[in-house]
Amino acid sequence: MNILRCRIENYRGFENADVLPRGHVLLVGEPRSGRSDLLAALGKVFEVDLTRLDERDFFRGDTSRDICIEVTLGDLGVELEQRFLDELEFWDPDARSLIPGSDELGDIPPDAVAVLRLAFRGRWDDVDERGDQTIYWTKRSDPASDNLRRVRREDRQAFAFHRLPGGRPLNLAPRGLLRSALSESEAEALTVALEEMRNGIDRLSGELALALPVIGALAATIDVLRPYLETDAPTPDVVRFLPDEGSLSGLLRALSPALDLGDGVGFLPLSRHGSTTHAQISMAEAIATSRHDHAVVVVDDFADSLDTASAQRLASLLRRACGQVWLSTRRPEVARGFEQPELIRLTRGNAPGQRHVHYGSIPTTRAQRVAARELHRQILPAMTARAVLVVEGPHDAAAHGALAERREEIDGTLPPEAHGIRIIDGGGQGGIDQAARLAEMSRSLGFRVVTLVDYDRDEAEAASRLAALQAAADVVVRLPRGMAIEAAILDDLPDADVISALGDVGATYLLPLSAGWETLTGNDLRREAMRALKSNNGLHAQFIQTLPGMLPTMACSALDTAVGCCRGVSATAFVQL
């Protein structure tokens, strides 16, 4: 089973959204873009026991408009198709849309797939001040006339949908994930075993009440109360010790898994093993239980407590085990277990409450494949950023990063990260052409993209590259003609500061400086400095970090301008410094 489409109206932060996954889903996005809301919306359609609906679940608290969440399910299997034969419709996998009039079998294309549509309607009752919730079949329902064909509770149980709860793993309670994966015969056997455990505890509690260290104190206590209790029964018949209420549900609440991991300390409660082990067990449980029914598994904030290797490995296993997995994450290494088209990124629009959906895609050209190499190295680590500042190469990125740190130390100017901006570069080869490719990919994933580049001396070539950049990015910021990053970070610096910083850098790194370089001044000194900064794979950041006084004027101006454009402070599409 897998979800082919999810349409949301007026639910939490979504006024209107249409999500069309391509197989499994890796859900990423900037803060407050709706990752958790989207997964919660899926859960509402498949809830067996409906959870509470309140005013805050309605878009902007407007309870006059109904919540509508519609899900289209494919890859149903024979059992679901036969059980819900009257509700079947057909889906065009190429157009990724429902085929209208699909009851006419002669009009159905040969590659069409059978689907079911289920929907959730949330309506606010002003009289009782509560939310009224209905899950219904879309095919033969008419919400406008309030004619809804409800999906019965037992029918909702037929759908293999698991939303991984935030509670403890290996939970034997009826709503626990482990318990839900049991077959009918296994569930009956577990019930018998739990009853035997409870009876055994009852027997042991009776023996405890008869134990010599206890009986005396209990008898003395009960003797004080006998006139009020009006009983002459022996003390063990009056007092027993039972775990948490004495009921089976209370017993299950008191039970928690304990693990012996072979480290010599024996069995320890899972909570004592730390957050990483807890998260590993939770994910392993989800993988094991989803294998039985090719389920749709939904996990929010996946891998927040996992180490890097476990995050990547468990994400890959979960993807292989499930019919379809929806993972929401902030961890970039999780993406290594997914295909690029399975990436969905949510962003916030400019208007309050506006949200957008963006999709990863398969690179089809050589230029796109080259840019895709930076997906895992730079773009996915920036997945939670609102904007990216694309520079030509690693030297540019290092220089601007160091400059931002120094400015915050000196005058409190906030760095790009404080505004939700990440600096990324064109990779090892770098260059304006690669920056344009990277900008195009970033923009397709919903980032606001600003590029900060050099101005080539060849005017015709500069014009051609500028046009490519403007087509790929939201804003292009260009340094003065003929100025590269090395010249920008030396701009307006006193000769004494340049000599001091080069001397400090040279104390750690072997710089190719000419004999007597300390006596150089003006342009001669700057040419020597630029040659030295390009050595040792670039020492731009180290130079900026050791500057004793003022910072370079042009580099600061360029960074300020680019950050302002990332924030949308400047509406212009091109800035020539």
Task: Label the predicted regions.
Residues 454-538:
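Activity-critical C-terminal alpha-helical subdomain
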Residues 1-27, 31-47, 53, 257-381, ...:
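Switch/communication elements of ASCE P-loop NTPase nucleotide-binding domains
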Residues 53-61, 78-198, 267-268, 471-472:
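Glycine-rich phosphate-binding loops of NTPases
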Residues 333-336, 341-450, 455:
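RecA-like P-loop NTPase motor core
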